[in-house]
Regions:
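N-terminal loops that bind phosphate or other acidic moieties
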Residues: 2-66, 75-142
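Conserved alpha/beta-hydrolase "nucleophile elbow" surrounding the catalytic nucleophile
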Residues: 70
Length: 142
């Protein structure tokens, strides 16, 4: 049986995708190939529709694809919407903990809607208004 490849795309307005990809690569020692799509950076750049189309054309139809987009309903997310399927998962409102968790998920574990949903729910707990949190700081941590 042929191994299914998992593809990772981080897509955003301007350079957020590049920065998040760079940080994930740094923290994971670049163990996974991650594509970054940075829209609306320069005048005269290739239209994002074309970039997305070419990217998906380079993948096998059996590949699993995880798309991390910056904003729900935004113009970047809209370019990935037509590609959504059982094998193409689009997550909006990205953050580092969510992206890391999904990139580090074993490729032996098939991506299901339930699995992706659970990671999204877990990542919501990583967004914290720290002023409202009471915790003791260990002086050894500083």
């Amino acid at each position: 049986m042929e191994k299914i490849l998992r593809r990772y795309i981080i897509a955003s307005h301007h350079k957020l995708a590049y920065g998040l990809k760079d940080t994930v690569d740094f923290l994971t020692n670049g163990i996974k190939k991650i594509y970054d799509v940075n829209a609306y950076v320069e005048d005269g750049e290739k239209p994002i529709e074309e970039v997305v189309s070419e990217l998906f054309a380079s993948f096998d139809e059996n590949d699993e694809v995880l798309v991390f987009a910056d904003m729900m309903g935004g113009s970047v997310y809209q370019k990935f919407y037509p590609y959504m399927s059982d094998k193409v998962h689009v997550v909006c409102g990205i953050n580092l903990p969510l992206t890391l968790a999904l990139v580090l998920e074993s490729e032996d574990t098939p991506l299901t809607q339930e699995l992706v949903h659970q990671y999204v729910e877990d990542s919501k707990n990583q967004i914290v208004y720290v002023n409202e949190v009471n915790f003791a700081v260990d002086e050894d941590d500083e």
